[in-house]
Amino acid sequence: ILPPESGIYRNPFREWIGAQIRADAFGYAAPGWPEKAAELAFYDGAISHDKNGIYGEMFVAAMISSAFVLDDAEQIINAGLGEIPKNCRLARAVKDTLEWCKTHNGWREVWEKINENYGHYHGVHTINNAALVVMGIWFGVNDFEAGIVNTVRGGWDTDCTGASVGSVLGAIFGASKLPRKWTDVFNDTLKSSVAVSYTHLTLPTI
């Protein structure tokens, strides 16, 4: 079965977060070019997802791409919004969350609004988790650690949301400005589970 049928046929998970968590590579591949990042994410997402499941991957890829050239949370989030259908359910959730971030005091209040309005979605659905990503970027744009930690504290698919926020904030700050406590543990090494000839690489060789 080829895309787009492969993302739809007998697939009750077509709007879950599985595509969104694959977005990072496309944001990295097209730094400062959110349109291209979203295009690549679309083709990837269509293999396994549909509609908002695909849009989530496009949204995050575009934000990561934009974060290489922007450092304003609202501009980065809007760059992601610009690459998905403006009236889709994901866009509505992102816009709602962005407004709550502007009008409420701190991430906890925003989390309460997200949970109140989007907590009915499954814990690994794209929409509610994307709202947490927006929250994490907004309140972490000047504090890498706070962005990741507060996103994870929001619950649901924590490893995915924390990673997405970390990718965006990492692109903003750049590797040299990330807190050492978050980078030293990697010992400058990438370990891959992909079945290729090289599974242990030092980062400078990549």
Regions found by a protein language model. Name each.
Residues 137-198:
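Catalytic phosphate/nucleotide-handling subdomain of diverse soluble enzymes
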